[in-house]
Amino acid sequence: MTLSEQAFAPARRDDIVPVLATARLVLRAPRRSDVKAIASFANDRRIAANTARIPHPYGIEDAEQFIAAVNKREGEACFVIMLECAPIGVCSVDLREDGPEVGYWLGVPYWGRGFATEAVRALIDHAFGDLEHETLISGARVTNPASRRVLEKCGFQWTGVRLSRIRAINSAAPIDRFRLDRGLWASLKSWGRVKLVV
């Protein structure tokens, strides 16, 4: 077994991470078969520069390491966003020092079509309904109003601005910070409950 194969041996989390279905999307655990799509989309500087941890350039090896790492982490939920059986992005709830953090990105060809909002709503429903978190946090670069709109449409409330390191630009940048509490989420659930696919 090669080193690459060893890294992926325990990588399937289909038995741990549920499959979530929305009107147009399916969210499921990352798989080795997603490596090329993830590498292709994440290698776009517009994506990397708007996330904290994606390097630029981003290659196949980066995608392999990402999938191996997220599938080994306990207590986190990472999903590949699927449209018509093809990966179009990633969303996750990561356990951070200041609370569970929602993160997401979509391949550029899928921007502006409501997919991010749809995926994040499903992720939020899972985080509050299944993982039983009390609060979620998230952030968007101040230069990324589209991501800010996604968070606001999902009920997140702005809490301030702070500097955060952006790996792709090798520097810190101002980030709008957001928070969503369980009570507000419960009052906004008119967007409909996500279906859990077993």
Predicted segments — roles?
Residues R46-A68:
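Conserved GNAT-fold acetyl-CoA-binding loop/helix
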